[in-house]
Structure formats: structure tokens, C-alpha cells
Amino acid sequence: MDKLIKTISESGSFRAYALDSTETVRTAQEKHNTLSSSTVALGRTLIANQILAANQKGDSKITVKVIGNGSFGHIISVADTKGHVKGYIQNPGVDIKKTATGEVLVGPFMGQGQFVSIIDYGTGNPYTSSTPLISGEIGEDFAYYLTESEQTPSAVGLNVLLDKEDKVKVAGGFMLQVLPGASEEEIARYEKRIQEMPAISTLLESDDHIEALLNAIYGDEPFKRLSEEELSFECDCSRERFENALLTLGKDELQAIKDEDHGAEIVCQFCQTKYEFSEADLEELIND
């Protein structure tokens, strides 16, 4: 089971989250049949949203949209505060690597665009904010969003590593945030450690990458573990939800679908589950 560890420095001036999202991203790859670059881009977006959701209180729903003008199109993710996340990428078939190293490329194919966050607190007035994409690598764009939009200086590292068959090997990351009251001396120490930190891909290769991430963030500084939360890819779609969507079309449109197509098939964008509605099903909806 994937998990996210919340921590805070002994001084109370820094908080850090470290997470293992391997099964989450693996499930997303299997459901959407994504190729290498699309897998990494979608995976990074899911991890960013898992972090963002962990930062929320109450029963909120968080939508992250990474909207670029490159090959990927847009990437959409929806998370809740219970550790569930779902998502999809408009173009699942991007598969581009550096010839010399085999490194999967993301940034150049995200293009220019926006990192958008929509937080729905359940009150009917969702809060939307956005920042421009600064690199298209998603992790850097997420850190920029946190610093600029949420006014919290943040360092973020997240990645998805693939095996030789381009299947998800490991996925995860971290977020470090400066809290009010941090001294300049403390900030300088943490900045130095982040700058000298091994590459996120190297840390993810560790036997226990959550511990490796926390050790890299805190060094010898004492910190407290606040909580451990389970994470998973989970879609909340249902036949009932799509029945309600069909009802919004109106009886005339449903009759036309019944007469012309003799039924309907709806595919959930987030998990690719197919829902079949026969002529009899449509007739029942028409007569509802």
C-alpha cells in the first residue's frame, strides 16, 4: 500500500511530506495503457495532487489541471483528503527518450501553459488559482505554484522511474515547506541540504525511499513524525452517476440515441471503465 508520511522539524519551523506512490502510478499506467513519457507526466501530476490533498483539512476535493500546448495535451487529476486520487492524460501515447541515456523526456513536450488548482470545500464556492508552467517538468511547476499562489516557500521533488519494459518501477517524492518563525540561519541550513541532495531518481532507488528522502531533507536535525496516511488510485465513478448524466440529455435526445444507436456505451475518462446501456435501459430512463 502506498503511503505518505507527515513530519515537522523539532523547532516547528519546517514541515516535510515524503511519499511512496508506486502502486498509485502503476494502477494509472495499467488503466490508461500509457507509454513512457505519458506515464511519467501523469504520474508526477498524481503525486503532486496527493501532496496538495494532504495539505488540506476537512472533506475537500482537489482538482489539479496541468494544461500545456505540447504533445501531452492536458493532464487532469482529482484527489480527496482520504488519500484517494484519480487522473488521466489527454494523450497517453507519448514515448520519447534521450538517445544517449534513455532518459524519459517530459518538460519539452508539456509546452507552455498553466498549473491550475481547484479546491472544493463542499460549500458550493470552489477556490481556483493558477500559475504559469515554468519548465513543464511538473515538480518544478508545482513548487512554483506553492510558493507563488499559496505564499509558502516550498521545495518539491517527485518522479516516476520505469523498468526496461517501461513499466512503473517506483514512484514518489517529497515536499518541504518553510513555516512562519523560521530563522534565516535555519533557512540557510535547509536550503544548503536541498541544493546538495542527491537526485530524486537516486533517492527513489533506495531500499526504503521514504526514509532516504527524510534523511536527505533533515540531515542530523531532529524531527517529529506526525502521521502516516494510506494512498491509492481510486475512481468513484458508478453506473448510477452515468445514468444521471444521461438523464440530463433530455427525453428527446435519449429517444434519438435509442432509435439510431440502439444503446449507449460510456467510458469513464479517469479509469476507462465501460458502462453499457441497452435499448431497454434507455427506454427505462425515458419513462422515468
Swiss-Prot record:
A GO cellular component entry from the record: cytoplasm
Any one Pfam family match given in the protein's UniProt record, by short name: HSP33
Keywords: Chaperone, Cytoplasm, Disulfide bond, Redox-active center, Zinc
Disulfide bonds: C235-C237, C268-C271
Transmembrane regions listed in the UniProt entry: none
A Gene Ontology molecular function term of the record: unfolded protein binding
Main subcellular localisation: cytoplasm
PTM per Swiss-Prot/TrEMBL: Under oxidizing conditions two disulfide bonds are formed involving the reactive cysteines. Under reducing conditions zinc is bound to the reactive cysteines and the protein is inactive.
Compartments (UniProt record): Cytoplasm
GO BP terms, alphabetized: protein refolding
Domain of life, per lineage: Bacteria
InterPro entries xref list: Heat_shock_Hsp33, Heat_shock_Hsp33_C, Heat_shock_Hsp33_N
Function: Redox regulated molecular chaperone. Protects both thermally unfolding and oxidatively damaged proteins from irreversible aggregation. Plays an important role in the bacterial defense system toward oxidative stress.
Family: Belongs to the HSP33 family.
Name of the protein described by the UniProt record: 33 kDa chaperonin
